[in-house]
Amino acid sequence: MIDRICISLNNRCNLNCSYCHFHEKGTMDDAPMDVLEILRNVKEYAGHSFKIGFVGNGEPLLDFPMLKDCLRFLEDSPLIQVYTITNGTIPLSDEDIRFLEQHRVNVGFSLDGYQELHDQNRCNSFGQVMRNVQKYRDVTGHYPTFNATVGEESLLNRERVISFFEPFGTRVTFSRMIGKHGIPLEEYR
């Protein structure tokens, strides 16, 4: 039974992280996709708990108006849970953060750990991400979840990485690297 889908709202990102494998092919097909039609089908056929992730080939918050349209469309579907993962560099207004909270969106910030580790692959964005994490907490009263990409450096410093995340008291998903600096995609299967 299918219980989740991931939807990429775009193929654009405001960063160029050294380990990102989504843009290795050079040009990405940015053919239009009717996201609302996909959501219409999910609403019609998912008669059970269902997860929708707005993640993938780009930074979803670059298309925040489209994300808001999708969330409004799903307002009458309490069995559908929504999450998104952002690189954390797009500043959101208090109103936008409250909108995400009111629509029960689990917002995950991509954060690889302490500053030196994060900045090593994520374009020196640690300070900006942490400001947005703090703003999210100030508005919602809780920290977002985190998604950390695991590579050799984080494995060599795992205690430091874990110690970095512990004070937040929230869920951290550790994802392995695929592509240039991780295992080849062919070996992942």
How should each PLM-predicted stretch be described?
Residues 1-35:
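Canonical Radical SAM [4Fe-4S] cluster-binding loop centered on the CxxxCxxC motif
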Residues 4, 58-62:
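Short coil/turn segments at secondary-structure boundaries
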Residues 9, 57-58:
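Short acidic donor-binding/metal-coordinating loop in glycosyltransferase active sites
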Residues 15-19, 117, 183-184:
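Short acidic/His/Gly/Ser-rich catalytic and metal-binding motifs that mark active-site loops
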Residues 26-29, 58, 119-122:
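The substrate-binding groove and active-site-proximal loops of carbohydrate-active enzymes
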Residues 35-55, 63-181:
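Radical SAM/AdoMet-radical enzyme domain recognition
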Residues 181-189:
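A C-terminal junction/extension of Radical SAM enzymes
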